[in-house]
A protein has these predicted regions:
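N-terminal export leaders
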Residues: 1-2
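N-terminal beta-rich core of secreted/periplasmic extracellular enzymes
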Residues: 36, 49-50
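Carbohydrate-binding surfaces of carbohydrate-active enzymes
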Residues: 8, 12-15, 28-35, 42-43, ...
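N-terminal amphipathic alpha-helix/helix-capping segment at the start of soluble metabolic enzymes
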Residues: 18-26
Length: 699
């Protein structure tokens, strides 16, 4: 994963007048993308434009998906109408979700590419003698078998020996002492999947392809993206964005209870052993039992390396394929993964979530709209915006979703609620919003006002770079090592352990933003490839003086060395809850432990006092003592420093603004609710309306 330039690099003050003009009257590219329907019906584009909508998300008709000439004609008519109305055109790359199946046509064409997962079947015994295992009735074939001596109840991987696979039976000879015979088989993955949950909603067959399979993914793009090019001709002026919706490895169980027989699925492709060997230097097959459990160091590292290999292969095969194809057509790629908020699912669904998202032109997320007082992970979009900044992507998108994380859907939310959720998401880096709230049930002037508010925020903040000087390590290695799959989603001791770790991490992230401390996530690769300069780490489009390490127990040695260099150069490292105990290979462990031995460790609840006062340098405007419900982030764009204030409360909030320059100054306050730009004297007091925001722009 490459990194972008430093904050503000390439920006010019000459661009700022364009920003001011866009704020006054936001062009369509900054306004809401409105979801269409899945029946192919003609959309009232002129009315939508009158309501201030900036674009449409079009879907090919579900009935007869991709095979109906009438559906193609309807889609073309909607595209022409949208272009005539001056709207953006985004197109969903599948019928509903999860993307990747082309409405089930991929598996129809290539049944061999349907998702098949690895399952384990084992038996234990003691002493010599014949031993065998039979293929489970639900599995198709064995792919590997091995017998291991047990030491303290654990398989000794380095002393295991292959067992003979003969058709549907594994045969072996028992070992001296206790042993475990393990067979690993492929099982078709259809029941209880996310894909099976959407059959009735979108009319597909529920048969999901293996996203690790190159043939499957070439077939997917051939049936979908390439079909649009064949039908519509040049796409550069026809479709702006292809949007992918929750493609994933599909190993999790989505029904109540557990998978029949308690069977546990692990993602698999025949190329994984070769890739694993090439990337990590040892054989995957002898350590296959570790993918299903084990807390010893060998098992944890095997899982770490396995899911990293899976993540690399998945990123190449799905999002990179789509993005590279789009470059040749002049169409950008976008999309939101499944359960973006959960570090557990960053592993379960993607191997390495950041690797997957990094390949998209426009990283995106699903944005819940819960009632006040309900759980709300408002900080979650920072995952996506951190990737965007690292990759130099200007646009970060979010779907305002009025259904998820709610007891009852709210398809016509009050405008203040829409402002509330867009403001908090913009605080965390989102600058393009889509939704399927029922726009036609609003007065056109009211909905136009919603679009203008959203458009003004996006007009100023798209292309801006976070000025955060606090980074939080993205501890994917530790989650990969700890993750053990389960027959029941989010159940079982191992899942609970990693989920609790993720919850503590979320609490820390929430506390940072609540106390006015913005931050950026840093993947280990970005730290490794960064440079240390005057007490700062310059990496992934940012410049950081503090790095928070949240329960990091696995730390690759090259990353550890860069962190040690950063610390020696005057940077601060805050270790939350634990110090690293492992490197990325056994011969790294001692060096990693010694490098940070004796460092202080803070509890999750003590991160804020341990940080103390943290503020990005170079800003002449400061806001102290934020009222409860008021949040702050700082950005840099086109040579301008921007202090962004969001009032999440129901009452007007006062913000005391001072100058760090030692004398008064004049700043411009951009009010996205009123649509005004007002010069103000600093120091002074500003009032932020409920569920609204202000952007204080230094001259």
């Amino acid at each position: 994963m490459g990194a972008a330039a430093e904050p503000g690099a390439g920006s010019t003050a000459a661009e700022w007048p364009k920003v001011v003009a866009a704020f006054a009257n936001p062009p369509a590219e900054f306004r809401l993308i409105q979801y269409g329907t899945h029946d192919g019906a003609a959309l009232p584009m002129a009315r939508m434009a009158e309501a201030g909508i900036g674009g449409v998300m079009l879907f090919m008709q579900s009935h007869g998906y991709l095979r109906s000439d009438d559906a193609w004609r309807n889609l073309e008519a909607n595209i022409r109408a949208a272009r005539t109305a001056g709207l953006q055109v985004w197109v969903g790359d599948d019928t509903g979700y999860p993307s990747g199946m082309a409405g089930g046509l991929v598996v129809e064409e290539h049944p061999e590419a349907e998702s098949r997962c690895l399952v384990a079947v084992c038996r234990e015994g003691t002493g010599p003698g014949p031993a065998h295992l039979d293929l489970p009735a639900t599995a198709e074939r064995f792919v590997h078998a091995c017998i291991y001596p047990l030491v303290d109840g654990r398989p000794a991987f380095d002393r295991g020996r292959p067992a003979t696979v003969s058709g549907q039976r594994i045969e072996s000879e028992g070992l001296e002492g206790p042993w475990r015979l393990c067979g690993f088989a492929l099982q078709l993955n259809r029941e209880g999947t996310q894909a099976s949950m959407t059959i009735s909603g979108f009319g597909h067959n529920g048969r999901y392809p293996n996203l690790l399979d190159a043939t499957a993914m070439a077939t997917f793009t051939g049936l979908t993206h390439e079909a649009y090019a064949r039908r519509l001709g040049s796409l550069a002026d026809t479709i702006d964005v292809f949007y992918t919706n929750e493609p994933n490895l599909m190993t999790s169980w989505f029904l109540p209870g557990a998978r029949p027989g308690g069977v546990v699925f692990v993602p698999w492709h025949e190329d994984l052993p070769r890739r694993f060997q090439a990337e990590h230097g040892y054989d995957l097959l002898p350590v296959l039992p570790a993918l299903f459990g084990g807390d010893d160091a060998v098992s944890r590292l095997a899982r770490r390396h396995f899911y990293e290999t899976v993540g690399t292969l998945l990123a190449e095969n799905f999002p990179r394929r789509i993005t590279e194809w789009g470059k040749g057509q002049g169409v950008r790629s976008a999309g939101h993964p499944l359960l973006e908020e959960s570090m557990v699912h960053h592993v379960a669904g993607y191997g390495d979530f950041f690797r997957f998202v990094s390949e998209l032109d426009i990283p995106a997320c699903d944005l819940p709209m819960p009632d006040r007082g309900q759980a709300w992970n408002f900080w979650m979009p920072r995952f996506l915006s951190s990737v965007a900044q690292a990759r130099g992507r200007a646009t970060v998108a979010a779907l305002l979703d009025p259904i998820i994380n709610r007891p009852v859907a709210q398809l016509v939310p009050p405008p203040a609620d829409v402002r509330r959720f867009t403001g908090m998401a913009a605080l965390c880096g989102v600058n393009q919003f889509a939704t399927y709230i029922l726009w036609h049930q609003y007065d056109p002037a009211v909905y136009r006002g919603v679009n203008e508010y959203v458009g003004r925020l996006s007009a100023v903040l798209r292309g801006a770079t976070s000025a955060a000087t606090v980074a939080v390590y993205y501890p994917i290695e530790s989650f990969q090592a700890a993750f053990v799959p389960s027959a029941s989603t989010l159940q079982g001791e191992a899942w609970e352990r990693v989920a609790e770790r993720g919850s503590r991490q979320d609490t820390m992230a929430q506390a940072l933003l609540t106390h006015g401390i913005d931050f950026t996530w840093l993947h280990g690769d970005w730290i490794r490839d960064g440079r240390v300069e005057q007490g700062h780490l310059v990496a992934a489009g940012g410049r950081y003086s503090v790095i928070v390490m949240p329960e990091v127990d696995v730390l690759p040695l090259p990353v550890a060395r860069k962190l040690a260099e950063f610390e020696a150069g005057g940077g601060r490292i805050l270790w939350m809850a634990t110090l690293p105990t492992m490197g990325d290979f056994p011969d790294e462990n001692a060096a990693v432990r010694e490098m940070f031995a004796g460092r202080s460790v803070v509890a999750p609840g003590d991160v804020i006092p341990a940080l103390g006062k943290v503020a990005p340098p170079g800003f002449a405007v400061a806001v102290d003592d934020l009222q409860p419900g008021v949040f702050m982030a700082k950005f840099v764009r086109d040579g301008r420093r921007i202090t962004f204030l969001v009032n999440d409360g129901l009452e007007p909030a006062r913000a005391t603004v001072r100058t760090t320059a030692g004398e008064g100054l004049t700043a411009d306050v951009f009010d996205p609710l009123a649509g005004t730009v007002t010069p103000v004297q600093v120091p002074g007091i500003l009032s932020v309306e409920p569920c609204s925001s202000l952007l204080i722009v230094e001259r």
